[in-house]
UniProtKB/Swiss-Prot annotation:
This is Uncharacterized mitochondrial protein ORF6. One of its GO terms (cellular component) is mitochondrion. It comes from the Eukaryota. Keywords: Mitochondrion. It comes from Paramecium tetraurelia.
Amino acid sequence: MRRAFIELDRVKGCFFRRGKRKAKKLNSSGAFAFGSSYAGTYLLDKHSRRKNNLYLRSFFFFKFYYCNLFNFNPGFIGAFYHTRPGVFFLDHFFFFNNFLEIPSFFENAAEAEPAQLMGHLVQDCAAQTTGRGLVNFERGLVDSKPKFLDAFFGLLSLKRTTNRFGILFFLIFCLRRA
């Protein structure tokens, strides 16, 4: 585990605060725990035997940032960048505090990106069936969603018994034209 976090520090430029990481893992009642770092908050899989970062060496590496709890500006939870026809790239996920401000935040977040990327950001929320260990991703995507996204979210919706990472996923937001 120590080697894993050293590697995470070298590759990702961050380092977990040991005390806060331990406290969050003990206090969290879900399948995941949030480990604080100087560069953000990372998702830890509580079902992992080695307690390594769930996405340290995986394609599913989601970096979380805390939003300011004292204002109504939510966090940007994800962007699928359209690089070429039929190809999308999942950049990152953030954590929302307020659903009502999502459209305006998308507009603000897109200032540094090409305007066409806004067409792939969404406001809708996918329902999470935590009790069964599934993620329901039936809502929110446009009708012409690529097969790549179908395969990607199919991996996220695996049952916990068949998923070696023990994934019980969290709230996730989908894509729709603003």
